[in-house]
């Protein structure tokens, strides 16, 4: 064998080994995410739906749960996509010729972006509708009852839904792009239809993030306050615990001996009051057992971190708005080739990259908090071991829409300079200056408004409670109803 043939063979072997290595790494990453999501979903599913007398119903619910687990794993992968790419770029910059990180390259990152895009399309368009129709189906009339009959009905329903959505998107694309090519795009299903449909879904997710993230940023302060032990400077915990235990014992006595009282009792109301008192007592015991560091330092530091992260997010978006007016390069754009390890995507180097990753995760958590806090989606909030299968499907779809829009959301707001890879950068609306500019301005305005309205009121209430001023005898003139009552007396 001649020398050129040996060189060609060695190059082919190297490409083959790199491709196999990328497949193994991608499979291991997905398997890890899948296991984590399966453990997470089993904590929220309703056990009665999987232990029913009808084996067909239990089998259908198990299949639907596996599809939801797959979708949630893709959603988690979409969340980790941009932070993993930013960190990988900084690692390659710091260790360019390290033997142990040769597996980390641009081809792997680009492949992960393409896989997330592909499976996001697959989950949103096929798997989740299939799971929903599968759980709701009963089989065609006259057919044999069982899983196979439900599969036939689900496939027919899914085909009809696919034709309906395909026709609607084709008509919409023909109206928007009024030319012959757009009308003939129905035949170019893979290259035009799916990216266009996913572009619409991504735009919907970005709009949803625009609404939920400012609301979540404002709600993060109250949510963190519920999770941490708040400082109380002028209060006696022992006295509050004694009063709570006394009230709980009195309510328990009334529930156990309802005949001892001559008034009619609302047992449901008494049970709710008892549950509230038990919850309050548990919180008081938690605060009593907390250390002085947790009581006096942990809560203020957490509030300060939230305030710094929120203020930094608004500041970065404000700077990005100015850059949009000055420099055309600030517009989000796609990048077909992943050229990693050449230049840092932050002006502050590795520290700036870490800040970008922290901000991306913080905004994603805030958007989820805002999503479940909004009145429109509050009914979707999952409950521990009491979430129906259809509700799990709805949660997985919403989380996938939010998470798949996170890379576009972060790049549109200028939180990172990392350009969108693969089909994520092919969205037509990303090149529209007015959409991007108005989106940034709306985010900055809504976030500032929510913070000013919520944070100031929360801080004022917390300071009043911290110093015990809420229990002080206030002047009667501050309360109109009370003043009128005293005047009548």
From Swiss-Prot:
Superkingdom assignment: Eukaryota
Membrane topology (UniProt): Multi-pass membrane protein
Family membership: Belongs to the LIMR family.
Spans within the Extracellular topological domain: 1-21, 88-114, 176-196, 327-350, 410-431
Keywords: Cell membrane, Endocytosis, Endoplasmic reticulum, Membrane, Receptor, Transmembrane, Transmembrane helix, Wnt signaling pathway
GO BP terms: hematopoietic stem cell differentiation; negative regulation of canonical Wnt signaling pathway; receptor-mediated endocytosis; T cell apoptotic process; T cell differentiation; T cell proliferation; Wnt signaling pathway
Transmembrane region(s): 22-42, 67-87, 115-135, 155-175, 197-217, 306-326, 351-371, 389-409, 432-452
Self-association and partners: Dimer. Can also form higher oligomers. Interacts with LCN1; this interaction mediates the endocytosis of LCN1. Interacts with UBAC2, FAF2, VCP, AMFR, ZNRF3, CTNNB1, LRP6, GSK3A, GSK3B, FZD6, DVL2 and RNF43. Interaction with LGB and SCGB1A1 is controversial.
Region (LCN1-binding): 1-76
Stretches assigned to the Cytoplasmic side: 43-66, 136-154, 218-305, 372-388, 453-489
GO molecular function: transmembrane signaling receptor activity
Species: Macaca fascicularis (Crab-eating macaque)
Gene responsible for this protein: LMBR1L
Annotated region described as Interaction with LGB, given as residue ranges: 1-59
Annotated compartments: Cell membrane; Endoplasmic reticulum membrane
One cellular component term from this protein's GO annotations in UniProt: endoplasmic reticulum membrane
Protein name in UniProt: Protein LMBR1L
Short name of one Pfam family: LMBR1
Record's function text: Plays an essential role in lymphocyte development by negatively regulating the canonical Wnt signaling pathway. In association with UBAC2 and E3 ubiquitin-protein ligase AMFR, promotes the ubiquitin-mediated degradation of CTNNB1 and Wnt receptors FZD6 and LRP6. LMBR1L stabilizes the beta-catenin destruction complex that is required for regulating CTNNB1 levels. Acts as a LCN1 receptor and can mediate its endocytosis.
């Amino acid at each position: 064998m001649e020398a050129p043939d040996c060189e060609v063979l060695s190059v082919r072997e190297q490409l083959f080994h790199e491709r196999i290595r990328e497949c193994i790494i991608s499979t291991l990453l997905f398997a890890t995410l899948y296991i984590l999501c399966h453990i997470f979903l089993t904590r929220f599913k309703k056990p009665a739906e999987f232990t029913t007398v009808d084996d067909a119903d239990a089998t259908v619910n198990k299949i639907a749960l596996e599809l939801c687990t797959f979708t949630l794993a893709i959603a988690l992968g979409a969340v980790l996509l941009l932070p993993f790419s930013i960190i990988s770029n900084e690692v390659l910059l710091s260790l360019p010729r390290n033997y142990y990180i040769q597996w980390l390259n641009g081809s792997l990152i680009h492949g992960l972006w393409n896989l997330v895009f592909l499976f996001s399309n697959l989950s949103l368009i096929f798997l989740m509708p299939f799971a929903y129709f599968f759980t709701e189906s009963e089989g065609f009339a006259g057919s044999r009852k069982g899983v196979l009959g439900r599969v036939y009905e689900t496939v027919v329903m899914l085909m009809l839904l696919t034709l309906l959505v395909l026709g609607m998107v084709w008509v919409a694309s023909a109206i928007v792009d009024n030319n012959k090519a757009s009308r003939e795009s129905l035949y170019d299903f893979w290259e035009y239809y799916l990216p266009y449909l996913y572009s619409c879904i991504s735009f919907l997710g970005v709009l949803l993030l625009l609404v939920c993230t400012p609301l979540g940023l404002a709600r993060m302060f109250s949510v963190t306050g519920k999770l941490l032990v708040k400082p109380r400077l002028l209060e006696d915990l022992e006295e509050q615990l004694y009063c709570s235990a006394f009230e709980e014992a009195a309510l328990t006595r009334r529930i156990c001996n309802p005949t001892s009282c001559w008034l009619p009792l609302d047992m449901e109301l008494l049970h709710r009051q008892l549950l509230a008192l038990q919850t309050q007592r548990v919180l008081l015991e938690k605060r009593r057992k907390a250390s002085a560091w947790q009581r006096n330092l942990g809560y203020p530091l957490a509030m300060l971190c939230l305030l710094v992260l929120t203020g930094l997010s608004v500041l970065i978006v404000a700077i990005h708005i100015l850059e949009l007016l000055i420099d055309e390069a600030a517009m989000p754009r796609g990048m077909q080739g992943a050229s990693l390890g050449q230049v840092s995507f932050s002006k502050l180097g590795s520290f700036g990259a870490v800040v970008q990753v922290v901000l991306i995760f913080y905004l994603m958590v805030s958007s989820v908090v805002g999503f479940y806090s909004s009145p429109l989606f509050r009914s979707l909030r999952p409950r521990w071991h009491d979430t129906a299968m259809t509700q799990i499907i709805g949660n997985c779809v919403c989380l996938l829409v939010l998470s798949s829009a996170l890379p576009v959301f972060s790049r549109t707001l200028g939180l990172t300079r990392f350009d969108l890879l693969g089909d994520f950068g092919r969205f037509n609306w990303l090149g529209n200056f007015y959409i991007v500019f108005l989106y940034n301005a709306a985010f900055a305005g809504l976030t500032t408004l929510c913070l000013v309205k919520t944070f100031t009121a929360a801080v004022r209430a917390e300071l009043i409670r911290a110093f015990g001023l809420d229990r002080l005898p206030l002047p009667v003139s501050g309360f109109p109803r009370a003043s009128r009552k005293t005047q009548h007396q």
